[in-house]
Amino acid sequence: MRILVTGATGFVGRTLCAVLAESGYQVRAAVRVDSRLADHMSERVVVGDIGPGTSWDAALRDVDGVVHLAARAHVLNDAPDNTRLYFETNQHGTEALARAAARAGVRRFLFLSSVKVNGEDSMTGAYGAADEPHPQDAYGKSKWLAEQAVRAVAGQSGMQAVIVRPPLVYGPGVRANFLRLMRWVDARRPLPLAAIDNRRSLVSVWTLCDLLATLLEHPAAPGTWMVSDGEDLSTPDLIRRIGRAMGRPVRLVAAPLGLLGVLGGILGKKAEVARLCGSLVVDSAPTRTKLGWSPPLSVDEAMHRTVAWYLSEGRPRDS
């Protein structure tokens, strides 16, 4: 089978292309600009920026399945002027690709959405695939509209639609709070986060890509799926796991949560602090039971792999 992967050179795309190639698929990598690709990306097609006017004809020729990863990524505190770009890329660009794929006779279309379609916190219980969506920002709203567009195209054409909503994805190349936590642990800084009593679902890039590969041919795949490593961690637990994988002592001290919120506001990091303190849990049990699938790695195994990348490539240059 020939599979078109958009966002093939991105954080998730690099790992997915390798997983698919190792599984015997012919991988066609859709890239924004011409660049040197890894050996397992046997075919490449340059599509430019993704939007409603992107031409997909060459990319979709003789393709059996599509995995659409490319998106305008969520950016904390993004400028208001950039809001339209989320909808142009994530909503309208996805719809245009789905319509082109249906015209080209693609059998199955996998769309990587986001748990942000469900909401920003799960204080009342774990998010499930059937829950009513409550996206809060432009990124989440654009992903929700894209999901609806993909389902509509599938309903009109017979193409099978598969949607996956991951929580925070970590692995080689991870950024934002996860990278920041690794750097703090590496620097042996005391962290005032011991009083945080939350739960957050995570998924390693290897587990996510294993699920995506499974969904390409599984007969029960059409539908919407939540995914996680299967073990939800508090922020202090996550820091301890990072420290264990890094071989570093972890220094956690308790600070009032209200004080953390005030400091976050003063430093312009309110959203980052909210994520460190808040809970966001997904119910991935139906994914495991209905598909007969399980994560290929434990949290600790994935953490060790991620830390190994950080120690070799992710550290600040002056470390």
Residue ranges: model-predicted function:
Residues 95-138:
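Conserved Rossmann-fold NAD(P)-dependent oxidoreductase catalytic core, especially the SDR/UDP-sugar
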Residues 47-91, 100-103, 120:
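NAD(P)H-binding glycine-rich loop region in Rossmannoid oxidoreductase-like domains
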Residues 171, 193-199, 225-233, 243-247, ...:
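Glycine-rich Rossmann NAD(P)(H)-binding loop
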Residues 3-23:
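N-terminal Rossmann NAD(P)H-binding glycine-rich loop of SDR-like oxidoreductase domains
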Residues 81, 88, 92, 122-169, ...:
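Catalytic helix-loop patch of NAD(P)-dependent Rossmann-fold dehydrogenases
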Residues 205, 237-240, 263-295, 305:
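Conserved C-terminal active-site "lid" loop/helix of NAD(P)H-dependent oxidoreductases
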Residues 174-180, 194-216, 222-223:
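Substrate-positioning beta->alpha
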Residues 215-270, 300, 304-307, 315-318:
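Mid/C-terminal beta-alpha module of Rossmann-like enzyme folds, strongest
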